Amino acid sequence: MPSRIGIDLDNTILRYDEVFYSLAQAELWIDRNCLCDKDAIKKELTKNAESAEKSEKRWQQLQAWAYGKDISKALVYDGLFNFTKQARLRGDELFIVSHKTEFSNFDPSVNLRRSALDTLGQRGFFKSIIQGGLGFSLQDIFFASSL
């Protein structure tokens, strides 16, 4: 029996570790020997900032960049394309869910949802399977604001 499967966009479909790392490195906010991992980067920001407030502002700035103007640099997790194609062959219904707000409080000039959709389009998510894509439509994408 086919299933209905929702896949979380951020940190399940798209991987941001390298984006956060390169952005934080460019700003000289982390040491070069910091692990390329979001949690490690956040800890490094805390260690290197003059205050907790400064650390949190830097983290929010990184998030605004990574989920907005630099989202196209995020990598698709290994195995996602194969999983999606196999699920479609089984007849499963697939959906993408994101709790991304429309605009970042830190940088309201970039529409985070539009940036995400553009990136998915560039990666072939909206192309048919026959065209080498993943066969999603805009109706398969759900943005749900967090409380």
Task: Describe every region a protein language model picked out.
Residues M1-R58:
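Active-site neighborhood of HAD-like aspartate-dependent phosphohydrolases
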Residues I7-L9, A74, V97-H99, F143-S145:
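Short His-Asn-centered micro-motif
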Residues T12-L14, V19-F20, K100-S104, L147:
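Short, solvent-exposed loop/turn segments at secondary-structure junctions
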Residues K43-K85, L89-D92:
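Metal-dependent phosphoesterase signature
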Residues I71, L80-L120:
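Substrate-recognition element of Asp-dependent hydrolases with the DxDx(T/V) motif
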Residues D92, F106-L147:
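C-terminal cap/substrate-recognition subdomain and adjoining C-terminal extension
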